[in-house]
From Swiss-Prot:
Cofactor requirements of the protein: FMN
Active-site feature positions: S173
Assigned GO CC terms: cytoplasm; plasma membrane
Membrane topology: Peripheral membrane protein
EC number: 1.3.5.2
Name of this protein: Dihydroorotate dehydrogenase (quinone)
Keywords: Cell membrane, Flavoprotein, FMN, Membrane, Oxidoreductase, Pyrimidine biosynthesis
Role of this protein: Catalyzes the conversion of dihydroorotate to orotate with quinone as electron acceptor.
PANTHER family: DIHYDROOROTATE DEHYDROGENASE (QUINONE), MITOCHONDRIAL, DIHYDROOROTATE DEHYDROGENASE (QUINONE), MITOCHONDRIAL-RELATED
Entry binding sites for FMN: A62, G63, Y64, D65, K66, T86, N139, N170, K215, S243, G266, G295, Y316, S317
Length: 362
């Protein structure tokens, strides 16, 4: 539960429009105004995923730290890893404002930001100043007006290869027209082939193989999930991130804001994204790493993602409502779960409810 000081801070931030509040939170992290809420290290929560050693399974999702301004500050407040971006080769302003909306009754957010970011150059300069030990992923995308979107992803791999601990190819944002078309089998095959070829080329140059994940939408058909699973396995991708925001608006209480165009995130996304996670786990088998995202607001929801097939989890929107102590509270809660269930590793619960979530009608 959110503490008294965080409650007051939230009330203050909610006096501002969402984008202004986001900027203030970045400034607070930059200036050290956010106290560390990190939980003690717990070996039962440590995970080896895609060749990387994660100190705990709770990460900051892409979208918060778009321009790599505060990755190390986020790690200090309790996240085991963080993901910057989405970054595009050239700076772009994104869509017209207003483009970010709070659904307070639902503890949700709708955004139609449109990959607003300062471009590769600005993010790269900041990441070069970070510790090489910091577990920072780079989420790469394509410029809205790009003549060759696949080339933009390849450029992202090459530009950030020396500083990224892992990459995420974001082809599932609903806010860049036509981007989700890259999830179609033929387009996906071309994209993954190009991205992985660039990765192998860069790995040969520097002697370090950086994992590549694919972030997918929660609004896929069964056939779409089949195609993605088949292509990911055929091409030898390192993992999936499930899922991005949804276009669905089922069971929302805030009907006024629900009519806004854009992707929905936060608590209402939990069931849908977790069901898609389980269905993808069923399709790809037990070995492919999956990061579960969508509606993670507590230790229990984080654990449920793991039970549904996730190796790691990420969050963002729920921290808007729960405050910066949320990652530390989740990590403490997962340690407590290990105590209660006498687990040697949190991994022991993985896949234990895949069948339940696969059958969930969402």
């Amino acid at each position: 539960m959110i503490g008294g000081l965080e409650h007051l801070a939230r009330r203050g931030l909610f006096l501002f429009d969402p984008e202004a509040a986001h900027g203030l939170s970045i400034t607070a992290l930059k200036t050290g105004l956010v106290p560390s809420c990190a939980a003690p290290a717990d070996p039962r929560l440590q995970q080896s995923v895609a060749g990387l050693a994660f100190p705990n399974p709770v990460g900051m999702a892409a979208g918060y730290d778009k321009n790599a301004e505060v990755p190390e500050a986020l790690l200090k407040i309790g996240f085991g890893f963080t993901e910057i971006g989405t970054v595009t080769p050239r700076p772009q302003p994104g869509n017209d404002k207003p483009r970010l909306f709070r659904l307070i009754e639902d503890e949700a957010v709708i955004n139609r930001l449109g990959f607003n970011n300062e471009g590769h150059g600005a993010a790269l300069a900041r990441l070069k100043a970070c510790s090489r030990e910091a577990l920072i992923g780079v989420n790469i995308g394509a410029n809205k007006d790009s003549a060759d979107r696949i080339a933009d992803y390849v450029t992202g791999i090459r530009t950030f290869y020396a500083v990224a601990r892992y990459f995420t190819a974001n082809i599932s944002s609903p806010n860049t027209p036509g981007l989700r078309d890259l999830q179609a089998r033929e387009s996906l095959a071309t994209l993954l082939s190009a991205v992985l070829a660039a990765r192998e080329d860069e790995a040969g140059k520097c002697g370090r193989r950086v994992p590549v994940f694919l972030k997918i939408a929660p609004d896929l058909t069964e056939e779409g999930m089949d195609d993605i699973a088949a292509e990911v396995l055929a091409q030898g991708l390192d993992g999936l991130i499930v899922s991005n925001t949804t276009l669905a608006r089922a069971r929302l209480r805030d009907r006024k804001q629900a009519s806004e165009v854009g992707g929905l995130s936060g608590k209402p996304l939990f069931e849908k994204s977790t069901a898609v996670l389980a269905r993808m786990r069923r399709r790809v088998g037990p070995d492919l790493p999956i990061i579960g995202v969508g509606g993670v607001s507590s230790a229990e929801t984080a654990a449920e993602k793991i039970r549904a097939g996730a190796d790691l989890v990420q969050l963002y929107s729920c921290m808007v409502y729960e405050g910066p102590s949320l990652p530390g509270r989740i990590v403490r809660g997962l340690s407590a779960l290990c105590d209660r269930e006498k687990l040697a590793s949190i991994r022991e619960i993985r896949d234990s409810r895949v069948d339940y979530w696969t059958g969930m009608n969402v």
